[in-house]
Amino acid sequence: MGNLPEFSIRDLVEAGVHLGHKAGRWNPAMAPYIYGVHKYKDIHVIDLRKTLVLLRDALSVLYDVVLKRGRVLFVGTKVQASNIVAEEATRCGQYYVNHRWLGGMLTNWETVSSSIRRLVEFERLINNNEGQFTKKELLMLDKQRGKLERSLGGIREMGGLPHALFVIDTNKEHIAIREANKLKIPVVAILDTNSDPGGVDYPIPGNDDSVRSIDFFCRAVSRTILEAIRSDLASSGVNIAAKGSDVAESYAGTAADAGHTPVSETLSAGGPTAGASPYIPEVGPSVVEVDTHKSAALPDSRPNDADVPAEDGVLPDPGVADGAALE
């Protein structure tokens, strides 16, 4: 395996990954991944020791998918994630849904493919118009094209079902996860303290609301995918330096030259059973005692907990026992 991106606990803290929701909004199934409850803010603090291990495991899975020339679909339709998901998926030559998940996008792929062909046809008609359409007709065509582009633009070149999903916010994207489970497509997802872990094969506990945290995770995934592409190109004898700096674009030109074993069945068989919940809801988080005078300030505040002032918060060190302060 090639070199996966390296991260430390401090990197996660600086990205605000540790910040959970208000304690009253938690999902008990997330208890194993919660360090405790902040003494003054009444928000859950995610155990970054577990996040670090599970992040590496998830990145290893995505690396293997891409190394076998599989497709990864980024899914994040919430406002905070939309632009980041599109940018990072595009940067690593993968696919995304960032506007709205259409029911049946995976389970009814033939119909979706037909809609993609309509999108291409609309673009052809608009671009090659030689006076056969009036301005009003062109506006109507462009409106239909725009609607299809928002929903399908990120998967128009996918050419088939993805081999893995990377999901931001499992509560919002539950339909996508359910469809992936039906088709035994592995799901990698960011799980916040209010998330439902059911159906997620490779969970990554973390803040799924902060732009900074979402950007951190998406960049980690895109960097991993690019590393897998570099490794595949190198093993195929491709001179990466000669191809230029755009590794993803270079890869697209060589991906169809050699056949690889499909990875969807392989990964699904090797991962946890879809829909299973290997979590311990009976275990609840304890209150973390911290000293606000000795501890470092929380680097970020949650957009949905705006009433909690970030400058008053402190973070317990995930690397030491409960009750210790981050010096």
Swiss-Prot record:
Keyword terms of this UniProt record: Ribonucleoprotein, Ribosomal protein
Gene3D superfamilies hit by this protein: Glucose-6-phosphate isomerase like protein, domain 1 (3.40.50.10490), Helix hairpin bin (1.10.287.610)
GO terms assigned for molecular function: structural constituent of ribosome
Region Disordered, residue ranges: 258-327
Key word Ribonucleoprotein present: yes
PROSITE patterns: RIBOSOMAL_S2_1 (PS00962), RIBOSOMAL_S2_2 (PS00963)
GO cellular component assignments: cytosolic small ribosomal subunit
Entry keyword Ribosomal protein: yes
Xref: InterPro entries: Ribosomal_uS2, Ribosomal_uS2_bac/mit/plastid, Ribosomal_uS2_CS, Ribosomal_uS2_flav_dom_sf
CDD domains found in the cross-reference section: RPS2
GO biological process, alphabetically ordered: translation
Family annotation (HAMAP family): Ribosomal_uS2_B
PANTHER family xrefs: 30S RIBOSOMAL PROTEIN S2 PROKARYOTIC AND ORGANELLAR, SMALL RIBOSOMAL SUBUNIT PROTEIN US2M
NCBIfam families referenced in this protein's UniProt entry, alphabetically: rpsB_bact (TIGR01011)
Similarity-based family: Belongs to the universal ribosomal protein uS2 family.
Protein's recorded name: Small ribosomal subunit protein uS2
Gene name for this UniProt entry: rpsB
